[in-house]
Swiss-Prot record:
Organism (species): Streptococcus sanguinis (strain SK36)
Name of the protein: Dihydroxy-acid dehydratase
GO biological process: isoleucine biosynthetic process; L-valine biosynthetic process
GO molecular function, a single term: magnesium ion binding
Function: Functions in the biosynthesis of branched-chain amino acids. Catalyzes the dehydration of (2R,3R)-2,3-dihydroxy-3-methylpentanoate (2,3-dihydroxy-3-methylvalerate) into 2-oxo-3-methylpentanoate (2-oxo-3-methylvalerate) and of (2R)-2,3-dihydroxy-3-methylbutanoate (2,3-dihydroxyisovalerate) into 2-oxo-3-methylbutanoate (2-oxoisovalerate), the penultimate precursor to L-isoleucine and L-valine, respectively.
Binding site for Mg(2+): D89, D131, K132, E453
Entry keyword Ubl conjugation: no
Assembly and oligomerization: Homodimer.
List of residues binding [2Fe-2S] cluster: C57, C130, C202
UniProt KW Magnesium keyword: yes
The protein's annotated pathway: Amino-acid biosynthesis; L-isoleucine biosynthesis; L-isoleucine from 2-oxobutanoate: step 3/4; Amino-acid biosynthesis; L-valine biosynthesis; L-valine from pyruvate: step 3/4
Matches recorded under InterPro entries: DHAD_IlvD/Edd, Dihydro-acid_dehy_C, DihydroxyA_deHydtase, DiOHA_6PGluconate_deHydtase_CS, ILV_EDD_C, ILV_EDD_N, IlvD/EDD_N
Active site: S479 (proton acceptor)
Length: 572
């Protein structure tokens, strides 16, 4: 175990500020919340969740927070419950509200830091459910660097319709099938009414489950917790255990900076590749590493991608949901398999105070005969499904997810749109034909603002049967539920004057997953001419989106809002 063991006095390393005579007014306020003389002698531990009634991902988190409080009390500390915001991607998707999704990641991070810092807690548990909750919590945890544990609200159960498993993405794709004449409106309604049966994060290897898994692999969540379903007894137990664990971290003197090492991030990328995780993992892991002062770049993803096979037959490109993985051993069983075959660093410390290898000894192997995780000898794909592309269309990089995509190289004419809505209208009107390259720009971190996801558009293309025949490129993002021939995070973005701003309808575009190329057949001379003729629209400048647009970095840097120049602060 890393970290110096603390004495009882040291444990209250922040809340002891309330002890002096001059802090009598502060204590008066705290007494009104139920604290007594005895309680002032114990550590104050926060429990902060993104509870909200607007989404199944988060609707149960307040009750889970109460369980974390019980664990904290059992270890002799004083728990205090807080709330912060969430934006539900599935509800915001395809609407102007989607601009607030990625923005919310940094608001969540800032609000957790403000609440925990403003009240001098000694440690805290962060509980999240929807996509941006996880990286937002982790950015705060890394920035504060006090004992903390992240606890995931758990995955939703699959919906059932006509004896088959369905989920939210089934509804999105149903729209494309309806437009193509393959489903009636009533059939789509039946899918809609059965897709989401209760609480929990979206059920495939989408962004919420991807990031919860990555955090467990990093060592900042309890082993096994990321794959426990939202409504399971295991989930209730792991939340209570998280409360206990964070107080034990405090007693051990164990901090996030002891856990969030370069090797930890390498392992998180490794498991993300093996499970076929979301493209958003690139963005969020870069941001989390930045907060932890760990050097991580897009190129690191390609290095690991070339070595790690894709093993999981999970949605969106596979047939199983995350609950199925839980039933055959969960994330720990996958980690055991990868560790045994030399893919992970087993000697890293985790929030339990034990190493990765020591934690995994307590878990069973993958269930014999299971079909969710394929063997290394016969993987779903020989290398990882998340690929970083470069070329004259994305000099700073772009992210492609190629799981389930048979096409290795696509060359076609661009059809350029400056909004997702315009692109959707064109697809629904059958103006996009096989071979086309649909390009949606001015939707990056600054241009959106907020880098909205294109799940509505990508799902309609797949639903119309064009998933392998039409490429979709954007300086925006894709949902973890997206699959098909898609490339996002193109950097520099159009709003920053990136080459995508000067692409025109009819230009030939190449996407090649073998050479990792993304390029346009436009000469440097023609590009310079177009640049001189193009006026980039002004940055959005009102409210929170205006603040975000003016502060956010490139997607290639994780779209962080504190990317200061090293010479100004010393922080890279």
């Amino acid at each position: 175990m890393k970290g110096k063991a603390m004495t009882d006095k040291d444990i209250r390393h922040r809340s002891k500020i309330y002890d002096s005579m001059v802090k009598s007014p502060n204590r008066a306020m705290l007494r009104a919340t139920g604290m007594t003389d005895k309680d002032f002698e114990t550590p104050i531990v926060g429990v902060i969740s993104t509870w909200a009634e607007n989404t199944p991902c988060n609707i149960h988190l307040h009750d889970l927070g109460k369980l974390a409080k019980e664990g904290i009390k059992a270890e002799g500390a004083w728990p205090v419950q807080y709330g912060t915001i969430t934006v539900a991607d599935g509800i915001a998707m395809g609407t102007p509200g989607m601009r607030f999704s990625l923005t919310s990641r940094d608001i969540i991070a800032d609000s957790i830091e403000a609440a925990m810092g403003g009240h001098n807690v000694d440690a805290f548990v962060a509980i999240g459910g929807c996509d941006k909750n996880m990286p937002g919590s982790m950015i705060a945890i890394a920035n504060m660097d006090i004992p903390a544990v992240f606890a995931y609200g758990g995955t939703i159960a699959p919906g059932k319709l006509d004896g088959k498993d369905i989920d939210l993405v089934s509804v999105f794709e149903g729209i494309g099938k309806w437009n193509h004449g393959d489903l009636t409106a009533e059939e789509v309604r039946r899918i809609e009414c059965n897709a989401c049966p209760g609480p929990g994060g979206c059920g495939g290897m989408y962004t919420a489950n991807t990031m919860a898994t990555a955090i467990e692999v990093l060592g900042m969540s309890l082993p096994g917790s990321s794959s426990h379903p939202a409504e399971s007894k295991d989930k209730q137990e792991d939340i209570e255990a998280a409360g206990r664990a964070v107080v034990k971290m405090l007693k051990m003197g164990l901090k996030p900076s002891d856990i969030l090492t370069r090797e930890a991030f390498e392992d998180a990328i490794t498991v993300t590749m093996a499970l076929g995780g979301s493209t958003n993992a690139t963005l969020h892991l870069l941001a989390m590493a930045h907060a932890a002062n760990v050097e991580l770049t897009l190129d690191d993803f390609n290095v690991i991608q070339e070595k790690v096979p894709h093993l999981a037959d999970l949605k969106p490109s596979g047939q199983y949901v995350f609950q199925d993985l839980y039933e055959v051993g969960g994330v720990p069983a996958v980690m055991k398999y990868l560790l045994a075959n030399g893919f992970l660093h087993g000697d890293r410390i985790t929030c339990t105070g034990k190493t990765v290898a020591e934690n995994l000894v307590e878990f069973a192997d993958l269930t014999p005969g299971q079909k969710v995780i394929m063997p290394l000898e016969n993987p779903k794909r020989a290398d990882g499904p998340l690929i970083i592309l470069h070329g004259n269309l994305a000099p700073d990089g772009a992210v492609a997810k190629v799981s389930g995509v048979k096409v290795r190289r696509h060359v076609g004419p661009a059809k350029v749109f400056d909004s997702e809505e315009a692109a959707i209208d064109a697809v629904l009107a059958d103006e996009v034909v096989d071979g086309d390259v649909v390009v949606v720009r001015y939707v990056g971190p600054k241009g959106g603002p907020g880098m909205p996801e294109m799940l509505s558009l990508s799902s309609i293309i797949v639903g119309k049967g064009q998933g392998d025949k039409v490429a979709l490129l954007t300086d925006g993002r894709f949902s973890g539920g997206t699959y098909g021939l898609v490339v996002g995070h193109i950097a520099p973005e159009a709003q920053d004057g990136g080459p995508i701003a000067y692409l025109r309808t009819g230009d030939m575009v190449t996407v090649d997953q073998d050479t990792k190329e993304i390029s346009m057949a436009v000469s440097d001379e023609e590009l310079a001419k177009r640049k001189a003729e193009t006026t980039i629209p002004p940055l959005y400048s009102r409210g929170v989106l205006g603040k975000y647009a003016h502060m956010v970095s490139s997607a290639a840097k994780g779209a962080v809002t504190d990317f200061w120049k090293p010479e100004e602060t010393g922080k890279k």
